[in-house]
Amino acid sequence: MPSIHVSKCADPAIKLAHRIAEVVRSKPNCVLGLATGSTPIPVYQELARLHREEGLDFSQVRTFNLDEYAGLPPTHDQTYRFFMEEHLFSKVNIKPENVHFLNGMASDYEKECERYEQELKAIGPCDVWLLGIGHNGHIAFNEPGSPRDSRTRVVCLTQSTIDANARFFGNDKSKVPTKALSVGIATIMESREILLLATGESKREAVTKSVKGKCETHCPASFLHEHPHCRFYVDMDAGKVVDNTCCQATNQASCCGSTSCHAAKA
């Protein structure tokens, strides 16, 4: 059955960025699904360096972002549009018409989500989705309880996610939007390849449940076991109790460390 491959090393963001660069070089007009938050910033820094110093060409690359807060104007410094411009798009030669975002100020969120889903289907599927993981195992804004067949939709953020994101809003939880637009788990799973980055001790429990646990709605990232080409890039803290290996979700949630599992040695 499909399984999650784990690559544990000191600089997982760099290794992940180089994998994305391989995809861009082999398919110049590739479609990338992109994540935001503090975790992927080093990935974008390395991609920008590869563009600046080694000529990595983004001129034909198309991108879709995972999610966007509901109710924040595009000029707000906490929108994910602003984030991507600050950390990647302004530093590479990507064309504005090739980047795609959900509109958090749309008058009809359901229609906006349907538009985005159809746009992704027309241009995609994504060659790579870059993901982070929340402390509660969420991917994008697919919080615990999100169904496996979920599509792009409006979601209500859990209190734990609001608490975690308050640091981006001056530690004022009242300023964190309570809703967001997010691609669904089924949308993510249609990508040809999924790369998830997790760093720090605070992500250890979520990584462990995702890699070694069963596929369950209470840990949305666990559904990634069903994808044929999914790799977790983790540092030593986040991956302390998992190995550089290929892990399969079963009723017993076993983890195999044999070379026949195509272990990803860092």
UniProtKB/Swiss-Prot annotation:
Alphabetized UniProt keyword annotations: Carbohydrate metabolism, Cytoplasm, Hydrolase
Annotated catalysed reactions: alpha-D-glucosamine 6-phosphate + H2O = beta-D-fructose 6-phosphate + NH4(+)
Pfam families: Glucosamine_iso
SUPFAM superfamilies, alphabetized: NagB/RpiA/CoA transferase-like (SSF100950)
Function: Catalyzes the reversible conversion of alpha-D-glucosamine 6-phosphate (GlcN-6P) into beta-D-fructose 6-phosphate (Fru-6P) and ammonium ion, a regulatory reaction step in de novo uridine diphosphate-N-acetyl-alpha-D-glucosamine (UDP-GlcNAc) biosynthesis via hexosamine pathway.
PANTHER family attached to this UniProt entry: GLUCOSAMINE-6-PHOSPHATE ISOMERASE (PTHR11280:SF5)
HAMAP family assigned to the protein according to its UniProt record, in alphabetical order: GlcN6P_deamin
Name used for this protein in its record: Glucosamine-6-phosphate deaminase 1
Organism: Giardia intestinalis (Giardia lamblia)
Gene: GPI1
